[in-house]
Amino acid sequence: MTEVTKINPSTAITELEPYEMAQTNKEVPTTSLLSKDYYGHSIEEPDENNPTRWRYERPLDTVRAWQYLIDCDENFKTKPHREQNQYRPTADSFRPLSFASMESKLTQRLSRHLSKTSSRHSRL
């Protein structure tokens, strides 16, 4: 038995286009959508190139978040959220690695020099 539905064929002609629906539906401001990350947390410092991402978000975190959104991985929900495992840069983290290795070399040289001078003074 077939069901008879009452569909008006002229609705396709008279219904609003998506851009018209967006203009008439002003309930949700777009700024509130942009200030949330993948988990629904608010973004205090958005990235300049991508405002839907936190400023210091690592690329791997972005990939994992997208993977979660695509696969709906249940194990992902049990992992800590962004605030708990996110990289927080400090002044030392922006120092080039060559300076860090140079500093350790200078410290080693200085300690060797001080030990040599102290041994010389003890012989006198």
Swiss-Prot record:
Per the record, the GO terms for biological process are:
regulation of cell wall (1->3)-beta-D-glucan biosynthetic process
InterPro entries documented for this protein: DUF2406
Q: Which residues form a coiled coil?
A: none
A GO-annotated cellular component: nucleus
Source taxon at top rank? Eukaryota
Q: Which PANTHER family match?
A: MEIOTICALLY UP-REGULATED GENE 9 PROTEIN
What is known about its subunit structure? Interacts with dil1.
Protein name per UniProt: Uncharacterized protein C19C7.04c
